[in-house]
């Protein structure tokens, strides 16, 4: 069964034990850099948030009609079994209807994501003059490569009904005549 924490320590579970949360993060983080060396260029963009608490729809009433039932849309949950005596989530069953499922679903949605990574090479002018070109650059770009988070879902940025961010790989050529 689920046990609710006596937050204020008065020995009673009541409205005084409620803890306010906010969807707004404590910090928003961003780091991007461009490095160039002998025709090579490298670009990297990291983004993240820290201290954001949200209701995880995969663990709350929007999933399986309000009960865990062991079906969590492919998200692995650390629930109690005789072989795994965890106290993170109650053991799911078809008869389980967790009364406090809403509080179980509040999770830290902090994350750090590598949004963009690009590597390119611009050919020297002496090489491309023979081809009657002013500029020739080849590059590869990848987006949404990595996300570091403890949030139990496909993405800490999206609701369960949305498609997760796709990874994209682009190869290109820039030519100036």
Language model features with spans:
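Extracytoplasmic gating/loop element in the C-terminal half of outer-membrane beta-barrel translocons
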Residues: 49-137
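Transmembrane beta-strands of outer-membrane beta-barrel pores
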Residues: 37-39, 48-52, 116, 123, ...
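Short acidic, gly/pro-rich beta-turn/loop elements at beta-sheet edges
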Residues: 43, 54-56, 129-131, 150-152, ...
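Membrane-embedded beta-strand positions of outer-membrane beta-barrel proteins
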Residues: 44, 138-140, 173
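Outer-membrane beta-barrel transmembrane strand signature
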Residues: 1-43, 89-109, 114-116, 120-128
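Strand-connecting loop/turn motifs
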Residues: 37-40, 126, 133-135, 145, ...
């Amino acid at each position: 069964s689920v046990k609710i924490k006596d937050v204020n320590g008065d020995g009673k579970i009541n409205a005084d034990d409620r803890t306010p949360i906010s969807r707004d993060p404590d910090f928003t983080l961003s780091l991007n850099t461009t490095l160039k060396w002998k025709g090579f260029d490298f670009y990297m963009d990291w983004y993240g948030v820290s201290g954001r608490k949200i209701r995880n729809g995969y663990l709350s009433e929007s999933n399986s009609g309000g009960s865990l039932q062991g079906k969590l849309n492919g998200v692995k949950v650390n629930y109690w079994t005789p072989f795994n005596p965890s106290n993170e989530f109650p053991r799911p069953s078809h008869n389980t209807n967790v009364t406090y499922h809403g509080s179980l679903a509040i999770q830290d949605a902090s994350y750090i994501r590598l949004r963009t990574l690009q590597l390119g090479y611009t050919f020297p002018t002496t090489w491309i003059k023979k081809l009657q070109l002013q500029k020739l650059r080849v590059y590869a770009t990848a987006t949404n490569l990595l996300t570091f988070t403890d949030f139990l879902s496909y993405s800490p940025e999206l609701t369960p009904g949305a498609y997760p961010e796709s990874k994209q790989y682009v190869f290109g050529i820039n030519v100036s005549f």
